[in-house]
Amino acid sequence: MMFFNDKKNERNGILVLPTGAGKSLIVADIASRLHQNVLVLQPSKEILKQNYAKYRSYGLDNCSIYSASFNSKEISEVTFATIGSIMAHIDDFDHFKAIIIDECHGVNPVEGQYATFIRKVKRKVLGLTATPYRLATAQGIETKDKGFMPNGSYKTSDYFIDDFHPMPGVTLKNACILKFITRTRPRIFHDVLYEVSIQTLLQRGYLANLRYFDMTTIDTSRVKRNSTGRDYDEQSLFEEFSRCGLGNQLSDIVKRLLHPKNGVPRKGILVFTQFITESEQLAREVEGVAVVTGATKSKERDRILEDFKSGKIKVLANVGVLTTGFDYPELDTVVMARPTMSLAMWYQIVGRAIRPFEGKDGWIVDLGENIKRFGKVGDLTLREDKPGQYYISGVVNGQYKPLTNVYFY
């Protein structure tokens, strides 16, 4: 409460809350205690539904939903909204004194709906996220620390770019830098107000300890970057997958997980693929595999997810649609059949299996060099060597390694 009540401090802040920290509960607690108009923004209808339901579960009825996805545009003391729905009616929210943004790592500080809205309303903003970082191309990064203040002004202070020591074949045009969101320039968020560590949640049993298996055969050094420099080129990836026979390897691994020579079969296997090609091949070659893509109709998707949770479907392959908003604590196996340059995506995908459940033995099976790149999610640590210089470190090849605020080749 002190954050919003401190009128002298105009700096925006974030809460770093890992999966399992009870983010919906925290949003509800903060919004209910403020006793003023609070706008809670979330990026999807699934997260909006969760946050709204949690708030109502405490017997609070001074709230409403403002979202086209729910066919509801009602403004109350506490309003839960999606950013896209309010953009044409920004003036209707001018009387709101506090803004809370869930999944705030998705806020583009340079452009987009969030930046436009925040610039216009000029209110203090509190962000919540489990993954407080954004991937950017090095060539697009400015060399001045420009801070974006609630009053609409810009504040320029110190230089922030780290020294660039190129590897062979790497230039500022194809190098990326993963920046902590309070250290992007320009920026919307300035300070980390509070953090719950993943290690604390693991120790207290709020998260499940996972076992990691590196089954990688692809070689990402052979794969080109796309035009943005922020991810792999899809055609180049497709060629590498074909070269190493990724589809065949995926089918073989899933068969072994379902029918091990020793040990107990996996109860539920969630597979992430880059292309629908691998998911469809898996469905052809392994009995009982269901596939969900962005083109799957909503009712069919809901049916498949319910059948997966009930055990009728043992293997669910998806193409980029279940990284967030899918909670299934019993899930004991995630197969990551694609590489990613995004630490946030790696965290979110591993997070599908990290919720605890009695008797659960969680496995992460990686086919995409992600363990070699980022390490285990349980080793991710928020550090601050100097005031305000936050970064995330992990354990890669047995050694601590900065994963943000360094050049990512």
How should these model regions be labeled?
Residues 91-134:
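SF2 helicase catalytic motif II
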Residues 352-382:
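Conserved segment of the helicase C-terminal RecA-like domain
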Residues 49, 64-73, 280-281, 288-320:
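Conserved helicase ATPase core of P-loop NTP-dependent helicases/translocases
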Residues 57-90:
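Inter-Walker segment of RecA-like/P-loop motor cores
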Residues 19, 25-57, 276:
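Conserved Walker A/P-loop ATP-binding site and its immediately adjacent core
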